[in-house]
UniProtKB/Swiss-Prot annotation:
Organism of derivation: Halorhodospira halophila (strain DSM 244 / SL1) (Ectothiorhodospira halophila (strain DSM 244 / SL1))
A Pfam entry, by short name: Hfq
The family this protein is said to belong to: Belongs to the Hfq family.
Gene Ontology CC terms: cytosol
Record carries keyword RNA-binding: yes
UniProt-recorded name of the protein: RNA-binding protein Hfq
Length: 90
């Protein structure tokens, strides 16, 4: 695995496995919402009413709808970090 993907892959994989709703902001400002169904080196497959293939180079930010816990590399499986939470104004 490339050094630059040491955080990206576990983050996306956790979002996929736990079916966490996400907001994906593209570099042109468009906001997409849905669940990550799959991903590879170049694309993320986002599922909502339809499936959308989003190229990673077009993504600015991925914001989970709730806190996500990731195991730290090189530490015990019980050690975890928390990745942000999207604020709701409802």
């Amino acid at each position: 695995m490339a050094k630059g993907q040491s955080l990206q892959e576990p983050f996306l994989n956790t979002l996929r496995k736990e079916k966490v709703p996400v907001s994906i902001y593209l570099v042109n400002g468009i906001k997409l919402q849905g669940q990550i169904e799959s991903f590879d080196q170049f694309v993320v497959l986002l599922r909502n009413n339809v499936n959308q293939m989003v190229y990673k180079h077009a993504i600015s930010t991925i914001v989970p709808a709730r806190r996500v816990r990731l195991p730290q590399q090189g530490e015990e499986a019980s050690a975890e970090s928390i990745v942000g939470e999207e604020e709701s104004n409802n």
